[in-house]
Protein backbone atom coordinates (compact mmCIF):
# COMPACT_ATOMS: atom_id res chain seq x y z
CA UNK A 1 0.00 0.00 0.00
CA UNK A 2 1.31 3.47 -0.84
CA UNK A 3 2.02 6.15 1.70
CA UNK A 4 -1.21 7.64 3.04
CA UNK A 5 -1.81 11.40 3.24
CA UNK A 6 -1.05 12.99 6.59
CA UNK A 7 -4.35 14.83 6.59
CA UNK A 8 -5.72 16.98 9.39
CA UNK A 9 -3.14 16.32 12.07
CA UNK A 10 -0.15 17.22 9.93
CA UNK A 11 -1.81 20.32 8.52
CA UNK A 12 -2.85 21.45 11.98
CA UNK A 13 0.66 21.06 13.32
CA UNK A 14 2.08 23.11 10.44
CA UNK A 15 -0.51 25.83 10.83
CA UNK A 16 0.14 26.12 14.56
CA UNK A 17 3.72 27.19 13.89
CA UNK A 18 3.27 30.89 13.87
CA UNK A 19 3.97 33.79 16.15
CA UNK A 20 0.84 34.76 18.02
CA UNK A 21 -0.02 38.43 17.64
CA UNK A 22 -1.20 40.28 20.72
CA UNK A 23 -4.93 40.87 20.66
CA UNK A 24 -6.20 44.43 20.72
CA UNK A 25 -6.98 45.37 24.29
CA UNK A 26 -10.45 46.25 25.49
CA UNK A 27 -11.65 49.81 24.91
CA UNK A 28 -13.10 49.88 28.42
CA UNK A 29 -11.69 52.79 30.45
CA UNK A 30 -9.01 51.95 33.00
CA UNK A 31 -10.27 51.50 36.54
CA UNK A 32 -6.84 51.64 38.13
CA UNK A 33 -7.88 54.12 40.76
CA UNK A 34 -11.13 52.37 41.67
CA UNK A 35 -11.20 50.55 45.03
CA UNK A 36 -10.99 46.86 44.22
CA UNK A 37 -13.32 45.21 46.68
CA UNK A 38 -16.13 47.65 45.95
CA UNK A 39 -16.00 46.86 42.23
CA UNK A 40 -15.56 43.11 41.83
CA UNK A 41 -16.69 39.90 43.44
CA UNK A 42 -14.03 37.39 44.37
CA UNK A 43 -14.52 33.65 44.79
CA UNK A 44 -12.68 32.34 47.85
CA UNK A 45 -11.88 28.82 49.00
CA UNK A 46 -14.57 27.28 51.19
CA UNK A 47 -12.30 27.38 54.24
CA UNK A 48 -10.97 30.90 53.62
CA UNK A 49 -11.47 33.72 56.11
CA UNK A 50 -13.56 36.44 54.47
CA UNK A 51 -11.46 39.04 56.26
CA UNK A 52 -8.16 37.47 55.19
CA UNK A 53 -6.43 40.02 52.94
CA UNK A 54 -4.18 37.41 51.33
CA UNK A 55 -7.10 35.08 50.62
CA UNK A 56 -8.84 37.90 48.77
CA UNK A 57 -5.67 38.61 46.80
CA UNK A 58 -5.38 34.95 45.84
CA UNK A 59 -9.02 35.07 44.81
CA UNK A 60 -8.34 38.01 42.52
CA UNK A 61 -5.44 36.22 40.85
CA UNK A 62 -7.50 33.06 40.42
CA UNK A 63 -10.28 35.15 38.88
CA UNK A 64 -7.87 36.49 36.28
CA UNK A 65 -6.02 33.21 35.69
CA UNK A 66 -9.23 31.32 34.93
CA UNK A 67 -10.79 34.10 32.84
CA UNK A 68 -10.43 34.89 29.13
CA UNK A 69 -7.74 37.41 30.12
CA UNK A 70 -8.99 39.96 27.65
CA UNK A 71 -9.28 42.80 30.16
CA UNK A 72 -6.64 44.34 32.41
CA UNK A 73 -9.26 45.36 34.99
CA UNK A 74 -8.55 42.50 37.39
CA UNK A 75 -4.79 42.94 37.02
CA UNK A 76 -5.04 46.61 37.88
CA UNK A 77 -7.15 45.56 40.84
CA UNK A 78 -4.45 43.18 42.05
CA UNK A 79 -1.74 45.84 41.74
CA UNK A 80 -3.98 48.34 43.54
CA UNK A 81 -4.65 45.89 46.38
CA UNK A 82 -0.96 44.99 46.72
CA UNK A 83 0.00 48.66 46.89
CA UNK A 84 -2.68 49.21 49.52
CA UNK A 85 -1.41 46.33 51.65
CA UNK A 86 2.16 47.59 51.38
CA UNK A 87 1.11 51.01 52.62
CA UNK A 88 -0.84 49.51 55.51
CA UNK A 89 2.04 47.20 56.43
CA UNK A 90 4.25 50.20 57.15
CA UNK A 91 2.06 50.99 60.15
CA UNK A 92 0.52 47.62 61.00
CA UNK A 93 2.89 44.82 62.02
CA UNK A 94 0.13 42.21 61.79
CA UNK A 95 -0.50 43.03 58.15
CA UNK A 96 3.24 43.04 57.49
CA UNK A 97 3.40 39.45 58.73
CA UNK A 98 0.87 38.42 56.07
CA UNK A 99 3.03 39.68 53.20
CA UNK A 100 4.49 36.27 52.48
CA UNK A 101 5.93 34.69 49.33
CA UNK A 102 2.44 34.29 47.83
CA UNK A 103 1.86 38.03 48.17
CA UNK A 104 5.11 38.92 46.42
CA UNK A 105 4.50 36.29 43.74
CA UNK A 106 0.98 37.44 42.89
CA UNK A 107 2.12 41.07 42.82
CA UNK A 108 4.91 40.18 40.37
CA UNK A 109 2.58 38.05 38.24
CA UNK A 110 0.08 40.88 37.88
CA UNK A 111 2.82 43.29 36.80
CA UNK A 112 4.19 40.82 34.26
CA UNK A 113 0.75 40.08 32.80
CA UNK A 114 0.09 43.80 32.33
CA UNK A 115 2.92 43.83 29.78
CA UNK A 116 0.59 42.04 27.37
CA UNK A 117 -1.84 44.93 27.46
CA UNK A 118 0.94 47.51 27.30
CA UNK A 119 2.37 45.81 24.21
CA UNK A 120 -1.06 45.88 22.56
CA UNK A 121 -1.90 49.51 23.40
CA UNK A 122 -2.67 50.90 19.95
CA UNK A 123 -3.22 54.40 21.31
CA UNK A 124 0.39 54.63 22.49
CA UNK A 125 3.39 55.32 20.29
CA UNK A 126 5.75 52.46 19.50
CA UNK A 127 8.39 54.06 21.71
CA UNK A 128 5.98 54.30 24.65
CA UNK A 129 4.83 50.70 24.19
CA UNK A 130 8.42 49.47 24.31
CA UNK A 131 9.18 51.63 27.34
CA UNK A 132 6.07 50.48 29.23
CA UNK A 133 6.67 46.80 28.50
CA UNK A 134 10.27 47.04 29.67
CA UNK A 135 9.29 49.02 32.77
CA UNK A 136 6.59 46.57 33.85
CA UNK A 137 8.89 43.58 33.36
CA UNK A 138 11.61 45.32 35.39
CA UNK A 139 9.14 46.07 38.17
CA UNK A 140 7.89 42.48 38.12
CA UNK A 141 11.40 41.05 38.41
CA UNK A 142 12.30 43.56 41.11
CA UNK A 143 9.23 42.50 43.09
CA UNK A 144 9.89 38.77 42.81
CA UNK A 145 13.57 39.21 43.66
CA UNK A 146 12.60 41.26 46.70
CA UNK A 147 10.32 38.41 47.72
CA UNK A 148 13.15 35.91 47.24
CA UNK A 149 15.39 38.01 49.47
CA UNK A 150 12.87 37.42 52.27
CA UNK A 151 11.84 33.88 51.26
CA UNK A 152 14.88 32.39 49.47
CA UNK A 153 13.54 28.82 49.55
CA UNK A 154 10.13 29.66 48.09
CA UNK A 155 9.47 27.32 45.17
CA UNK A 156 6.52 29.48 44.15
CA UNK A 157 8.62 32.65 43.84
CA UNK A 158 11.29 30.82 41.85
CA UNK A 159 8.60 29.56 39.51
CA UNK A 160 7.17 33.07 39.14
CA UNK A 161 10.63 34.36 38.23
CA UNK A 162 10.98 31.64 35.59
CA UNK A 163 7.57 32.56 34.19
CA UNK A 164 8.47 36.24 33.91
CA UNK A 165 11.74 35.44 32.13
CA UNK A 166 10.08 33.03 29.67
CA UNK A 167 7.41 35.63 28.94
CA UNK A 168 9.84 38.51 28.61
CA UNK A 169 12.14 36.95 26.00
CA UNK A 170 9.58 36.94 23.17
CA UNK A 171 7.43 39.88 24.23
CA UNK A 172 10.12 42.46 24.97
CA UNK A 173 13.17 41.23 23.08
CA UNK A 174 12.40 38.99 20.10
CA UNK A 175 9.36 41.04 19.06
CA UNK A 176 11.65 44.02 18.43
CA UNK A 177 14.20 42.12 16.34
CA UNK A 178 14.39 41.80 12.55
CA UNK A 179 16.40 39.51 10.29
CA UNK A 180 19.45 41.77 10.26
CA UNK A 181 19.50 42.60 13.98
CA UNK A 182 22.84 42.45 15.78
CA UNK A 183 23.22 42.98 19.51
CA UNK A 184 26.12 41.30 21.30
CA UNK A 185 24.83 42.45 24.69
CA UNK A 186 21.48 40.67 24.29
CA UNK A 187 22.14 37.20 25.72
CA UNK A 188 18.88 35.35 25.12
CA UNK A 189 20.43 31.95 25.81
CA UNK A 190 21.64 33.16 29.18
CA UNK A 191 18.19 34.46 30.03
CA UNK A 192 16.50 31.23 28.99
CA UNK A 193 18.95 29.20 31.07
CA UNK A 194 18.34 31.52 34.02
CA UNK A 195 14.62 30.83 33.72
CA UNK A 196 15.15 27.07 33.43
CA UNK A 197 17.37 27.16 36.51
CA UNK A 198 14.50 28.51 38.61
CA UNK A 199 11.79 26.28 37.12
CA UNK A 200 10.50 23.20 38.91
CA UNK A 201 7.30 21.16 38.97
CA UNK A 202 5.04 22.96 41.45
CA UNK A 203 2.73 20.30 42.83
CA UNK A 204 0.56 22.90 44.59
CA UNK A 205 -0.56 24.35 41.25
CA UNK A 206 -0.44 22.00 38.27
CA UNK A 207 -2.29 24.44 36.00
CA UNK A 208 0.21 27.21 36.64
CA UNK A 209 3.14 24.86 36.05
CA UNK A 210 1.55 23.64 32.81
CA UNK A 211 1.07 27.20 31.58
CA UNK A 212 4.71 28.08 32.19
CA UNK A 213 5.89 25.03 30.26
CA UNK A 214 3.55 26.04 27.45
CA UNK A 215 5.27 29.43 27.46
CA UNK A 216 8.57 27.67 26.83
CA UNK A 217 6.91 25.62 24.09
CA UNK A 218 5.63 28.80 22.43
CA UNK A 219 9.01 30.49 22.85
CA UNK A 220 10.86 27.63 21.15
CA UNK A 221 8.31 27.70 18.33
CA UNK A 222 8.90 31.43 17.86
CA UNK A 223 12.67 30.91 17.86
CA UNK A 224 12.48 28.04 15.39
CA UNK A 225 10.30 30.00 12.99
CA UNK A 226 11.86 33.42 13.45
CA UNK A 227 11.60 35.34 10.18
CA UNK A 228 9.11 32.90 8.67
CA UNK A 229 5.98 34.71 9.79
CA UNK A 230 4.95 35.79 6.31
CA UNK A 231 5.39 32.38 4.72
CA UNK A 232 3.51 30.73 7.59
CA UNK A 233 0.62 33.16 7.28
CA UNK A 234 0.43 32.48 3.56
CA UNK A 235 0.35 28.76 4.33
CA UNK A 236 -2.57 29.23 6.71
CA UNK A 237 -4.55 30.99 4.01
CA UNK A 238 -3.75 28.38 1.42
CA UNK A 239 -5.61 25.16 0.65
CA UNK A 240 -2.56 23.74 -1.09
CA UNK A 241 -0.64 21.56 1.33
CA UNK A 242 2.53 21.83 -0.76
CA UNK A 243 2.49 25.60 -0.31
CA UNK A 244 2.59 25.17 3.46
CA UNK A 245 6.26 24.13 3.41
CA UNK A 246 8.21 26.55 5.55
CA UNK A 247 11.01 28.57 4.02
CA UNK A 248 14.35 28.13 5.76
CA UNK A 249 15.69 31.41 7.10
CA UNK A 250 19.44 31.65 7.63
CA UNK A 251 20.37 34.00 10.46
CA UNK A 252 23.83 35.45 10.86
CA UNK A 253 25.79 34.09 13.85
CA UNK A 254 25.76 37.61 15.31
CA UNK A 255 21.96 37.66 15.44
CA UNK A 256 20.61 37.45 19.03
CA UNK A 257 18.22 34.62 18.08
CA UNK A 258 20.90 32.53 16.33
CA UNK A 259 22.34 30.95 19.53
CA UNK A 260 18.82 30.01 20.62
CA UNK A 261 18.20 28.30 17.30
CA UNK A 262 21.40 26.32 17.74
CA UNK A 263 20.21 25.06 21.13
CA UNK A 264 16.67 24.13 20.07
CA UNK A 265 17.18 20.37 20.22
CA UNK A 266 18.49 20.50 23.79
CA UNK A 267 15.72 22.85 24.89
CA UNK A 268 13.00 20.68 23.34
CA UNK A 269 14.48 17.72 25.18
CA UNK A 270 14.33 19.72 28.43
CA UNK A 271 10.72 20.62 27.65
CA UNK A 272 9.65 17.04 26.95
CA UNK A 273 11.31 15.81 30.13
CA UNK A 274 9.54 18.39 32.29
CA UNK A 275 6.15 17.83 30.66
CA UNK A 276 6.70 14.13 31.32
CA UNK A 277 7.46 14.83 35.00
CA UNK A 278 4.39 17.03 35.23
CA UNK A 279 2.22 14.26 33.78
CA UNK A 280 3.61 11.80 36.33
CA UNK A 281 2.65 14.23 39.10
CA UNK A 282 -0.89 14.77 37.78
CA UNK A 283 -3.85 12.56 38.66
CA UNK A 284 -5.52 11.00 35.64
CA UNK A 285 -8.91 12.31 36.76
CA UNK A 286 -7.75 15.93 36.64
CA UNK A 287 -9.05 17.88 33.66
CA UNK A 288 -5.59 19.15 32.79
CA UNK A 289 -4.17 15.62 32.52
CA UNK A 290 -5.40 15.26 28.94
CA UNK A 291 -3.93 18.63 27.97
CA UNK A 292 -0.51 17.67 29.29
CA UNK A 293 -0.62 14.29 27.54
CA UNK A 294 -1.77 15.93 24.30
CA UNK A 295 1.11 18.40 24.37
CA UNK A 296 3.57 15.58 24.94
CA UNK A 297 2.08 13.69 22.01
CA UNK A 298 2.49 16.72 19.77
CA UNK A 299 6.08 17.23 20.94
CA UNK A 300 6.99 13.63 20.11
CA UNK A 301 5.32 13.88 16.71
CA UNK A 302 7.46 16.94 16.15
CA UNK A 303 10.56 15.02 17.18
CA UNK A 304 9.63 12.32 14.66
CA UNK A 305 9.19 14.76 11.77
CA UNK A 306 12.78 15.05 10.57
CA UNK A 307 13.66 11.32 10.60
CA UNK A 308 10.23 10.59 9.09
CA UNK A 309 10.87 13.05 6.29
CA UNK A 310 14.25 11.48 5.55
CA UNK A 311 12.90 7.93 5.60
CA UNK A 312 9.88 8.67 3.42
CA UNK A 313 12.05 10.44 0.85
CA UNK A 314 14.09 7.24 0.65
CA UNK A 315 11.10 4.89 0.74
CA UNK A 316 9.38 6.68 -2.11
CA UNK A 317 12.57 7.84 -3.83
CA UNK A 318 11.97 10.09 -6.82
CA UNK A 319 15.66 10.13 -7.71
CA UNK A 320 16.42 13.38 -5.91
CA UNK A 321 17.23 11.84 -2.53
CA UNK A 322 20.77 11.49 -1.28
CA UNK A 323 22.03 7.92 -1.65
CA UNK A 324 22.36 6.16 1.70
CA UNK A 325 23.04 2.60 2.77
CA UNK A 326 20.29 0.18 3.77
CA UNK A 327 21.63 0.31 7.32
CA UNK A 328 21.32 4.10 7.46
CA UNK A 329 17.80 3.93 6.05
CA UNK A 330 16.86 1.32 8.65
CA UNK A 331 18.30 3.42 11.46
CA UNK A 332 16.36 6.53 10.48
CA UNK A 333 13.20 4.42 10.12
CA UNK A 334 13.64 3.00 13.63
CA UNK A 335 14.22 6.48 15.06
CA UNK A 336 11.08 7.85 13.44
CA UNK A 337 9.05 4.83 14.56
CA UNK A 338 10.30 5.15 18.13
CA UNK A 339 9.18 8.77 18.44
CA UNK A 340 5.88 8.20 16.65
CA UNK A 341 4.99 5.27 18.90
CA UNK A 342 5.85 7.39 21.92
CA UNK A 343 3.58 10.13 20.59
CA UNK A 344 0.76 7.60 20.18
CA UNK A 345 1.09 6.54 23.82
CA UNK A 346 0.52 10.11 24.98
CA UNK A 347 -2.24 10.88 22.46
CA UNK A 348 -4.10 7.77 23.61
CA UNK A 349 -3.92 9.13 27.17
CA UNK A 350 -5.21 12.49 25.91
CA UNK A 351 -8.21 10.97 24.10
CA UNK A 352 -11.52 12.16 25.56
CA UNK A 353 -14.78 10.27 25.12
CA UNK A 354 -16.75 13.43 24.42
CA UNK A 355 -14.22 15.03 22.06
CA UNK A 356 -13.93 13.38 18.61
CA UNK A 357 -11.14 15.80 17.69
CA UNK A 358 -8.88 13.96 20.13
CA UNK A 359 -9.80 10.68 18.44
CA UNK A 360 -8.77 12.10 15.08
CA UNK A 361 -5.40 13.11 16.51
CA UNK A 362 -4.85 9.49 17.46
CA UNK A 363 -5.95 8.35 13.99
CA UNK A 364 -3.55 10.79 12.33
CA UNK A 365 -0.71 9.42 14.45
CA UNK A 366 -1.62 5.90 13.32
CA UNK A 367 -1.42 7.12 9.72
CA UNK A 368 2.03 8.54 10.45
CA UNK A 369 2.95 5.19 11.99
CA UNK A 370 1.67 3.26 8.98
CA UNK A 371 3.65 5.44 6.60
CA UNK A 372 6.83 4.54 8.49
CA UNK A 373 6.26 0.78 8.61
CA UNK A 374 7.53 -1.53 5.88
CA UNK A 375 5.46 -1.09 2.74
CA UNK A 376 2.53 -3.54 2.41
CA UNK A 377 3.52 -5.31 5.64
CA UNK A 378 0.91 -6.73 8.01
CA UNK A 379 1.90 -4.09 10.57
CA UNK A 380 1.31 -1.30 8.10
CA UNK A 381 -2.10 -2.66 7.12
CA UNK A 382 -3.04 -2.95 10.80
CA UNK A 383 -2.02 0.66 11.50
CA UNK A 384 -4.07 1.95 8.55
CA UNK A 385 -7.04 -0.21 9.55
CA UNK A 386 -6.95 1.19 13.09
CA UNK A 387 -6.78 4.74 11.73
CA UNK A 388 -9.75 4.09 9.43
CA UNK A 389 -11.86 2.69 12.27
CA UNK A 390 -11.11 5.63 14.54
CA UNK A 391 -11.80 8.17 11.79
CA UNK A 392 -15.08 6.43 11.00
CA UNK A 393 -16.21 6.57 14.63
CA UNK A 394 -15.15 10.21 14.98
CA UNK A 395 -16.96 11.15 11.79
CA UNK A 396 -20.13 9.41 12.91
CA UNK A 397 -20.01 10.93 16.40
CA UNK A 398 -19.49 14.42 14.96
CA UNK A 399 -22.22 14.06 12.31
CA UNK A 400 -19.87 14.15 9.33
CA UNK A 401 -17.35 16.73 10.53
CA UNK A 402 -14.42 14.60 9.40
CA UNK A 403 -15.86 13.23 6.16
CA UNK A 404 -13.26 15.01 4.02
CA UNK A 405 -10.46 13.67 6.18
CA UNK A 406 -11.86 10.15 5.97
CA UNK A 407 -12.37 10.36 2.20
CA UNK A 408 -8.88 11.72 1.70
CA UNK A 409 -7.43 8.85 3.71
CA UNK A 410 -9.42 6.16 1.91
CA UNK A 411 -8.48 7.55 -1.49
CA UNK A 412 -4.80 7.31 -0.56
From Swiss-Prot:
The keyword Lipid metabolism does not apply. The modification Phosphoserine is found at residue 30. GO terms for cellular component: nucleus. InterPro entries: Nro1/ETT1, TPR-like_helical_dom_sf. Keywords: Nucleus, Phosphoprotein, Transcription, Transcription regulation, Translation regulation. Its main location: nucleus. GO terms for biological process: positive regulation of SREBP signaling pathway; regulation of translation. It comes from the Eukaryota. Residues 1-45 are annotated as: Disordered. Residues 32-41 have a biased composition (Polar residues). It is found in: Nucleus. Pfam families: Nro1. Residues 17-31 have a biased composition (Basic and acidic residues). Interacts with STM1. Belongs to the ETT1 family. Required for correct translation termination and probably involved in regulation of hypoxic gene expression in association TPA1. Inhibits replication of Brome mosaic virus. This is Enhancer of translation termination 1. It comes from Saccharomyces cerevisiae (strain YJM789) (Baker's yeast). The gene is ETT1.
